[in-house]
Structures are given as structure tokens and as C-alpha cells.
């Protein structure tokens, strides 16, 4: 089955050798996504909700490039750098997925690739055959 590689032009994709998303058949896997700009720093410093909103927008765009939508998402994984961000990030998750209700995990991590980044999110989607 052929793989379709999707890039968002993020600062590390080419350098580190990965794709924003990989579509294979009826599935697409979206890599850990932050709101990092070309300089690798957050576009919404000190704003976990703003970062999450931007990240879900990037994920939505990557899904669209693969012919999928947020409605196809079956799992999300959210990583935050402090427990104080959980409520803000999960509230934004609810804005995007309230009716879709994918399986979801949120984990507190020690740090992300740049200190200005507070949130990183992955998503897996599967197109329904019904």
C-alpha cells in the first residue's frame, strides 16, 4: 500500500527526517505537532490554549491534505510541560472534538524541543467504511 507523506513546512521536518503526517490506505498518522514558527519558537508564548488552538489548526490542515477531516480522528495524544496547562488544553480539545470524541491521552512531560513550547499534540485518523 503506498504511503503519502504530508509536510507542513515546520522547522524540523526536513532537518530531522520526518513528515507532519503519513497517510496509508484508510489511515493517517499526524506527528507530534507544536505551534513553532520558522525560528523554532512558539507563536503563542506563555499561552497554552493559544498553542493548542494553533496546533489543532495545523493538524486539521494536514488531515485535509491527506483527504481526511477532524471527524475521522480516532485518537489524540497531548503533551504539556506543566500540570497547570491541562485544563486549558483539554478545553480547546473539547472545542474541536466535543461531538467527535476520539480516544485521548494527556501527559505531563519535563520539556519539549524549545522552552517556549508548552503543548505538543499527535493525532491518528481512520476513514470510516460505512
Predicted regions and their residues:
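N-terminal presequence-like segments and the immediate start of the first folded domain
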Residues: 1-57, 61-74, 80-130
Amino acid at each position: 500500500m503506498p504511503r503519502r507523506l504530508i509536510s507542513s513546512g515546520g522547522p524540523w521536518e526536513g532537518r530531522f527526517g520526518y513528515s507532519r503526517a503519513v497517510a496509508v490506505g484508510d489511515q493517517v498518522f499526524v506527528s507530534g505537532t507544536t505551534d513553532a514558527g520558522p525560528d523554532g519558537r512558539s507563536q503563542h508564548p506563555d499561552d497554552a490554549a493559544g498553542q493548542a488552538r494553533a496546533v489543532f489548526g495545523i493538524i486539521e490542515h494536514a488531515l485535509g491534505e491527506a483527504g481526511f477531516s477532524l471527524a475521522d480522528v480516532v485518537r489524540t495524544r497531548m503533551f504539556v510541560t506543566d500540570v497547570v496547562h491541562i485544563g486549558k488544553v483539554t478545553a480547546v480539545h473539547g472545542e474541536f472534538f466535543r461531538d467527535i470524541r476520539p480516544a485521548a491521552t494527556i501527559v505531563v512531560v519535563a520539556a519539549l524541543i524549545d522552552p517556549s513550547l508548552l503543548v505538543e499534540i499527535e493525532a491518528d485518523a481512520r476513514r470510516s467504511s460505512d
